[in-house]
């Protein structure tokens, strides 16, 4: 299990990006984190993946643990070897390399040739278009194909937990739906997923549990299905007019949803 407890993060010693954030990503589940720009979503992933220091950020308090291991003191390479792998926002593939070379780069930390071959076969099975274009340079792929390649490259490391940072960013609605299906399939194959998204429809559609980040704090949490029924999420993230009559939240939902206050 990936566990975040009481996490406080600042940039440059002055800008407080996360304030007392706590959440858990249980084994075998998809957990979604919603929030607007500047809410702290990317900072959360940077802290988990070990890349926070590269952005002049630091952990002031709290912890990030994967099982018994403290990730707060690990560098990105160590975190990947432990099985926690991030797909960064904006895809960031190697445009001058071919699809196959990008995938090989993702598996560089794995010295087991048979395991790398299995991982590549898994990627090509999940994304047949990447196999068709294996000799094509990454820069020539469409936006959706580049996102598939970014996810595939991360899967080459055989992650136990996959961190996805805004995978729907800049993609057409049809492709966003396909990305959601991919997330669900990755999870069905045994990988836990922490999905950071602004597209609440896709995220809540595939997640088991969800959290809402607001200016660095968790403002709401609960099951994804129940969160989707709240006025706040419907108004801010699903574009629904909550002044119109709708089915009331059930008693069970009210009990399990948690609103966080300072």
Predicted regions and their residues:
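A short, flexible loop at the N-terminus of ABC-type nucleotide-binding domains that lies
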Residues: 1-4, 8-20, 26-27, 52-57, ...
